[in-house]
Amino acid sequence: MASADDYFSDFEDDELDKLYEKAINKSVKETITRRAVPVQKDLHDNVLPGQKTVYEEIQRDVSFGPTHHELDYDALSFYVYPTNYEVRDYQYTIVHKSLFQNTLCAIPTGMGKTFIASTVMLNYFRWTKKAKIIFTAPTRPLVAQQIKACLGITGIPSDQTAILLDKSRKNREEIWANKRVFFATPQVVENDLKRGVLDPKDIVCLVIDEAHRATGSYAYTNVVKFIDRFNSSYRLLALTATPASDLEGVQEVVNNLDISKIEIRTEESMDIVKYMKKRKKEKIEVPLLLEIEDIIEQLGIAVKPVLQQAIELGIYEECDPSQINAFKAMQQSQKIIANPTIPEGIKWRNFFILQLLNNVGQMLKRLKIYGIRTFFNYFQNKCTEFTTKYNLKKSTNKIAAEFYYHPILKNIKNQCENYLSDPKFVGHGKLQCVRDELMEFFQKRGSDSRVIIFTELRESALEIVKFIDSVANDQIRPHIFIGQARAKEGFDEVKYTRKHAPKGRKKVERLHRQEQEKFLEAERTKRAANDKLERSARRTGSSEEAQISGMNQKMQKEVIHNFKKGEYNVLVCTSIGEEGLDIGEVDLIICYDTTSSPIKNIQRMGRTGRKRDGKIVLLFSSNESYKFERAMEDYSTLQALISKQCIDYKKSDRIIPEDIIPECHETLITINDENEIINEMEDVDEVIRYATQCMMGKKVKPKKAITKKKRVQENKKPKKFFMPDNVETSIVSASTLINKFLVNESGGKQLVTSNENPSKKRKIFKALDNLENDSTEEASSSLETEDEEFSDDNNVFIAEGQNGCQKDLETAIIRTGESLTTLKPLHNFERPNMALFVNDCGLPTKIEKNVKDIRGNQHNLEKEKNCTVDKNNMVLSLDDWNFFRDRYIPEGVSFDVEPNFVQYTKGVKVPHCHKVSKIITLFNDESNDNKKRTIDMNYTKCLARGMLRDEKKFVKVNDKSQVDNNSVNHDSSQSFTLSNAELDDILGSDSDF
């Protein structure tokens, strides 16, 4: 017979693999090759720790079975290539490879990535009958652009498409079930996959735009991981202009998206050069102003002692004070904090030194790249913040105090204030270059041309707008274009000082403080309103307001609309304008600053030269030229490494059977009227609205007042959990997972099935569960005790007196009637417990049904004789009475009315009965060695022995059938009278006490 361990054995590894891979047609075969490698050994011929003696090579052979998608074999013989646009060689090649492999398409911006994706989607729409095609983009504007382009290229019927952007989940299940082509953000797809609304097995084609974002835990990565768990037979096409900044980043994207092939093109590629518009690049080196160099020198003098200390401690590399780098200082500080071996005191000292160097590095960067105005705002804020905290003793950083209280910083502050007080002062040479370039450009091209200026900092963007506006040229109309976040507020010295000032102990002081705070708050509100009113009067007022409060999507949309319309012809953008927005045709790009990221640089330059020639002006100061050239060289090297197959790719399913090789049919696609309408729309929200109405099968109508109607709530579909095939989805009880065994007569184990599970029937007395006993006797045995535990002898005898007459005792029975006189509960502490007394012959006195003579001191039972209760409310049922009659001795049982604890003992404890109270008092006296109690006990014992010796009857039973509780006298001294001689004889006898 199998042992118990066999029933609880774990799954084998191959069983687990089969369990997780039942739903996919992918099989992996691994071949491991091991080779011995030389290792270092000690004198005892033992391998040193950490040495590997074997080198392993793992080769994985991946194969795919037939796809689970329902294919249209009549359409598999060819694929359609639209000829509505110019046929380009690189697009033709990439489309052909993307149909049969998971491809990462990396080509310059404006080179038709959307056309490639649309063609792939069109053919998988033709080849499959029910499968889903999904196009994902990270933002709403990008999704709107893609649905506009795809429907205008492929001609896919609009009733088969859906756009999923809104947070509302209304009709989402129905949309996924009835449509085939979807345009959505990756977050929507991820959420619907997790909710069970979208079946991952239904997906046959997934297009990912801006694929360089597929790193870490971004939604793109999560979507692909989720689909891979259930489906390996789907095509993935990733689109980007720059896959990553380095080889490791490219490999991460390839791994996360299951890429099998990278199709990369540069502006110098042979098959793309002829289609590229001319982009003239102009690099301008801008020297630093003398005022800037003077401030840099003074900052170097102030920070030199701190820098020298950092160099001596080995936490920062040796350099000139003017070359302090904020990024390097931040990296070093993070390493120090993460190092657990450094003592806490040394760790925080080094951290504060590097933190100060980081702040100085930020000052130098702003001064060299953006100018004195941007520098002074940051410098003044940091100085004010530290000095205020240090004066209030909220900071004890002496290293930073040595710098911020340096006398030379006061000189820097005074110089900057003098410079900025002059309205004609130019804070940096780049501003003059921007003005000259714009003047020359608009004189040649006219005011109908468009210009974008890129900068990283918001303060710098606003400064550029104000400076351009000061030129007072009607041809140049600038506006800022930034993100939605509000500007960071500077350090408020007054607010911080008042917050940490003494609150005041007296009520008058607290009230005075509250009045001051209200007054200051009113002043701030009034000043903010006045400033806003002044800004609205200036031409740059909207830009200033946007810089303070940020630009929401509505404001961004309005600015872009005005830019396309010509109300503004110069946009000063932060990184928000680098990708993802359809800003339109731009003729001039000015990069006010540069970064070390080739992705950012390429995205910026890709905003021009799409449909006509453009110009790019790169402004360099300090070491920006070196950073730009190095970034572009690294990207060129990266492209070469990708072309040399230095990436570890993943094999993907062909989906189409191997014996079918589709031919290319170049076809002119006929676009229907609805798709043509979408293609002609310019407004993003209008495109989304129209596509949504087409998705819902509605005609576009002007908005009207809608009368609300009561909706009949439909039954929601239960959430669906996607699992591998042939998996038990129902709930399994724990008892079915355990095997039960019994030992049979031969001593072996016998498996017990669920039908053979033995169970003992036990008699339960429900009435006994409700009894409240107040006795010192031991509790009766458990109600679950079987009948056999009680004695079978129904005849009980009592020997009494010397004669020892024995007679059968009859159990006193109270017969239940249809109605009984209602009795109020008697308080046990007012009377002794009602036991059954025996007469001279030992026979019990029967207690009649009429119990009207039983009464308490506080309840008048005579007034309630006529009250009746149902017989079911008695203490015991008939079966319980019979059980007591057969099993119990009458002297040990007393029957009483069930007490109503809820009514009479609601707020107090139920006291003990008279008998129990006397026993408790007795034992307390014995524990306390009460002599009076001892004498009384001896006296009682002696009286009892004397009476037994004389054979006197000491129990007298009233012949009457009714017993009065008050007639019972428990004082033994009053029951008998003895002479003095008899008493002395008794007291002189031996005593057990």
UniProtKB/Swiss-Prot annotation:
UniProt keywords (A-Z) are: ATP-binding, DNA damage, DNA repair, DNA-binding, Helicase, Hydrolase, Nucleotide-binding, Nucleus
Main location as per UniProt? nucleus
Describe the location of the Helicase ATP-binding domain by residue ranges.
Answer: 94-261
User: In Gene Ontology terms, what is a biological process of this protein?
Assistant: double-strand break repair via synthesis-dependent strand annealing
- The domain of life for this entry's organism is Eukaryota
SUPFAM superfamilies cross-referenced by the UniProt entry: P-loop containing nucleoside triphosphate hydrolases
Q: What is its EC number?
A: 3.6.4.12
Skewed-composition ranges (Polar residues): 539-551
State the InterPro entries in the record. FANCM/Mph1-like_ID (IPR039686), FANCM_DEXDc (IPR044749), Helicase/UvrB_N (IPR006935), Helicase_ATP-bd (IPR014001), Helicase_C-like (IPR001650), P-loop_NTPase (IPR027417)
Motif position, DEAH box: 209-212
**Domain Helicase C-terminal positions:** 507-655
Give GO terms: molecular function aspect only.
3'-5' DNA helicase activity; ATP binding; ATP hydrolysis activity; four-way junction DNA binding; four-way junction helicase activity
Subcellular location as annotated: Nucleus
Catalytic reactions on record: ATP + H2O = ADP + phosphate + H(+)
SUBUNIT field: Interacts with the MHF histone-fold complex to form the FANCM-MHF complex.
Q: What is this protein called?
A: ATP-dependent DNA helicase MPH1
